[in-house]
């Protein structure tokens, strides 16, 4: 959260004590160098008490305000303090902890998915369902393809395209413009960046902000554990909890935000673009048109999933590296910009010294803090990195275009088929739910597990891209097995004529399989959590 602590003349780095003495109680330049140790002691005592410098300093903002201007606050804008409001103890829902040395656009995408993704998926599905009903009721025109589907197009490729179109538009609009009202702490908004005196008081009250927060969101990247300030925030948050209270820490790797969006884009391209092409190919061509369609779909899958697999392998490598780094973490190894730049600001005040003095107040000595990082904090990181980034609900949200495509098929069946159209439509809906909630998540889990297993780079750099083929072919194999199983479920005649019962049978196979795999295996790495006397979430 470095920019929140910077005077206008300082570089945008992680500085807790930059000119704080001057901002709170200015002193003559000739005496500034004579009292840095006393000033550092004073600042450390104030920060260590975890109380606000004044009642009006403790402020929060709404999560949606950070998204204004397409993440203007994440880019370090300093004129957003007016978006904050005064709050009270434990009234801040979440403290956002992040490194300003990480990618801004990755953080923006990750936050959008974290806060807006579920709402966007729900609204998009409702909108696509309404569009499907309107098309089935002949209130919407045929958007694309032949006017008479029954004469010019095989029934297996009937699509209305309305559900996918409406769903995609609503999802994008909700993702970008939905404004969640959750109260959060974000440095450049909650700490005044213009008024030096108020800025100094805000810096002095950073412990109070942490103590007033019910949970912490860590936007994790490769630079996070290398920075003194970010690790100090985590330690201070754990220290601020009441005796016996389980700290609530939520970790979101910023590298995975774009990855989930790419997965969704891949699914949209495979289903929507390929369906559009199939309407033209299959209504005009014969013979080899199916092979052209399959080749196009495979090409789209190959490009999208290859990038995803590469990103997953990079993420799993960073998780392994961070686990090793935290296991031997030492204060002497983390970076502090004021030391890197030779203390050119602040009249000799040193961020590192202030932080170290606070740590000694809270943990007794530096060795105790390092031990806690190597045990409790490392266990927290490992627990969150292995559990949260690949939950079933997150994968389902990323695969929601599958449902839109089958809603398009259902609406086309309801409109054009002659024999019990609504029964045929219900069959397509059941089929869509099975693929969306069952087959898709299982294929994703297999891809992630193999990416984790083969995370290390090949010693021969030219062969490394070939490793990405293993998860890709595994996904193709899972889809092939699902298609075979689906066809086998079509064979028996169950309770009623039609295929709805058969699709429910197919769903009865794949849905429990997906739930069991995510419940007992998981798509993330199963990392070893060390035994510690400290409690972890």
Predicted region positions:
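The feature represents the membrane-entry module of six-transmembrane cation channels
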Residues: 3-537
């Amino acid at each position: 959260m470095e920019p929140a602590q910077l005077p206008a003349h300082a570089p945008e780095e992680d500085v807790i004590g930059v000119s704080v003495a001057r901002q709170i109680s200015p002193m003559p330049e000739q005496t500034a160098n004579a009292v840095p140790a006393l000033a550092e002691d004073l600042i450390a005592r104030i920060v260590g008490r975890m109380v606000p410098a004044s009642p009006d300093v403790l402020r929060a903002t709404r999560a949606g305000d950070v998204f204004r201007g397409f993440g203007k606050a994440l880019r370090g804008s300093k004129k957003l303090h007016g978006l904050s409001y005064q709050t009270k103890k434990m009234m801040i829902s979440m403290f956002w902890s992040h490194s300003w040395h990480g990618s801004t656009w990755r953080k923006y995408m990750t936050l959008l998915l974290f806060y807006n993704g579920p709402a966007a998926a729900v609204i998009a599905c409702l909108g696509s369902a309404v569009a499907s009903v309107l098309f089935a009721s002949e209130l919407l025109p045929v958007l694309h393809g032949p006017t008479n589907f029954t004469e010019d197009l095989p029934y297996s490729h009937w699509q209305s395209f309305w559900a996918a179109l409406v769903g995609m538009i609503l999802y994008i609009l909700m993702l970008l413009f939905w404004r969640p009202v959750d109260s959060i702490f974000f440095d450049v908004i909650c700490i005044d960046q213009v008024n030096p005196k108020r800025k100094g008081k805000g810096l002095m009250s950073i412990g109070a902000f942490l103590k007033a927060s019910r949970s912490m969101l860590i936007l994790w990247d490769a630079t996070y554990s290398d920075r003194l300030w970010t690790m100090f925030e985590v330690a201070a948050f754990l220290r601020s909890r009441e005796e016996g209270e389980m700290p609530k820490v939520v970790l979101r790797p910023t590298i995975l935000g774009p990855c989930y969006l790419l997965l969704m884009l891949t699914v949209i391209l495979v289903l929507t673009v390929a369906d559009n092409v199939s309407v033209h190919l299959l209504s005009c061509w014969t013979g080899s048109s199916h092979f052209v369609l399959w080749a196009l779909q495979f090409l789209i899958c190959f490009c999208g999933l290859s990038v995803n697999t590469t990103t997953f392998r990079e993420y799993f490598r960073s998780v392994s590296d961070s686990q090793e780094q935290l296991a031997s973490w030492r204060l002497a190894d983390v970076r502090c910009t004021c030391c890197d730049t030779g203390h050119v600001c602040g009249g000799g005040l040193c961020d590192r010294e202030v932080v170290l003095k606070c740590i000694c107040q809270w943990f007794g000595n530096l060795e105790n803090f390092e031990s806690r990082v190597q045990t409790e904090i490392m266990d927290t990181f490992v627990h969150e990195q292995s559990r949260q980034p690949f939950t079933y609900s997150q994968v389902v949200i990323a695969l929601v275009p599958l449902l839109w495509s089958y809603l398009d098929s259902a609406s086309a069946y309801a409109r054009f088929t002659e024999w019990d159209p609504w029964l045929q439509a219900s069959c397509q809906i059941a089929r869509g739910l099975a693929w969306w909630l069952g087959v898709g998540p299982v294929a994703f889990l297999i891809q992630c597990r193999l990416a984790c297993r083969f995370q290390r780079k090949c010693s021969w750099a030219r062969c490394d891209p070939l490793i990405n083929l293993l998860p890709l072919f595994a996904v193709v194999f899972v889809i092939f097995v699902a298609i075979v199983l689906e066809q086998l479920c079509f064979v028996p005649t169950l309770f009623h004529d039609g295929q709805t019962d058969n699709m429910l049978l197919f769903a009865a196979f794949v849905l429990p399989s997906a739930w069991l795999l995510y419940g007992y295996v998981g798509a993330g790495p199963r990392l070893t959590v060390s035994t510690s006397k400290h409690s972890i979430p």
